[in-house]
UniProtKB/Swiss-Prot annotation:
Active site (record annotation): 52 (nucleophile)
Catalytic activity from the UniProt record: uridine(38/39/40) in tRNA = pseudouridine(38/39/40) in tRNA
Disulfide-linked positions: none
Species the sequence originates in: Coxiella burnetii (strain Dugway 5J108-111)
Name by which UniProt lists this protein: tRNA pseudouridine synthase A
Family (UniProt): Belongs to the tRNA pseudouridine synthase TruA family.
Alphabetical keyword list: Isomerase, tRNA processing
PANTHER family: PSEUDOURIDYLATE SYNTHASE, TRNA PSEUDOURIDINE SYNTHASE-LIKE 1
Length: 261
């Protein structure tokens, strides 16, 4: 039995999230069908971060076990020939059996991209979020500082989250502007359901002047989702990096999405 790690990129617009759900189109379901065709036996895939419906990934990492022998090249090109065009396998690598895409990960990084203009984006509407009021990224950065560190993030946890604990550790939050786009970049050890989208909702309210930067601290301390801001739409969210111990020697991919410089 061999264990294979994969790098995966996908546009999540047409999918009901990563995780397999009966009678629904999911990224995991499509990847497993494609790999099963290459392996000639059923393949079950485990990923680093189970993205929600409509959320994208430029650097998802997954693994599967197989009794089939294929070269790394064959796994990549064989799977891609069986996948829909909005999912791509970027790389494949044989790994030791102690590697686990989810539990071996040390950190994940997400980017939420907001098109900040009074007129909504027509062409990239499925690829970025939108806010029509001017956003002050310095105010957003000031609010974000209250969220860095290890905290109970119950106020940022979506309903139905199955995590055993709401405690997470945020290593870094960076807010920056690229022309008309404001990028909210968050790195943490792990994330709760809707956590990044709820953080983005709070920071956008701060950036638009609706709330003061210290409102982020008020929301955090409340430990009550009802005290938080709106949950921003999923289309602007990307899983852009998963970090692992260097001994696994996994390929490094550039942070995405590709349309950011």
């Amino acid at each position: 039995m061999a264990r294979i790690a994969l790098g995966i990129r996908y546009d999540g617009s047409a999918y009901h999230g990563w995780q397999v759900q009966e009678a629904l189109k999911t990224v995991q379901g499509e990847v497993e069908k494609a790999l099963s065709a290459v392996a000639n036996h059923p393949v079950f895939v485990t990923c680093a971060g189970r993205t929600d419906a409509g959320v994208h990934a430029s650097a998802q990492v997954a693994h599967f076990d197989t009794t089939a022998y294929r070269s790394d090249h064959a796994w990549v090109f064989g799977a891609n020939s069986n996948l829909p065009h909005d999912i791509s396998i970027l790389w494949a690598k044989a790994v030791e059996e102690d590697f686990h895409a989810r539990y071996s990960a040390m950190a994940r990084r997400y980017r939420y991209i907001v098109y900040n203009h009074e007129i909504r984006p027509a062409i990239l509407r499925k690829a970025i979020g939108w806010h029509y009021r001017p956003l002050d990224e310095k105010r957003m950065q000031a609010g974000a500082q209250y969220l860095i560190g290890e905290h109970d993030f119950s106020s940022f946890q979506g309903a139905g989250c199955q995590s055993r604990t709401p405690v997470r550790k945020i290593f870094q939050i960076e807010i920056y502007r690229i022309r008309r786009m404001v990028v909210i970049e968050v790195q943490a050890n792990a994330f709760l359901l809707h956590m990044v989208r709820n953080i983005a909702g709070v920071l956008i309210a701060i950036g638009s002047g609706e709330k003061h930067p210290d409102w982020a601290q008020t929301v955090l301390k409340a430990k009550d989702r009802r005290q938080g801001g709106v949950t921003v739409p999923p289309n602007g969210l990307y899983l852009v990096e998963v970090n692992y111990p260097p001994n696994f020697k996994l390929p490094r991919m550039p942070l995405g999405p590709f349309f950011l410089p």
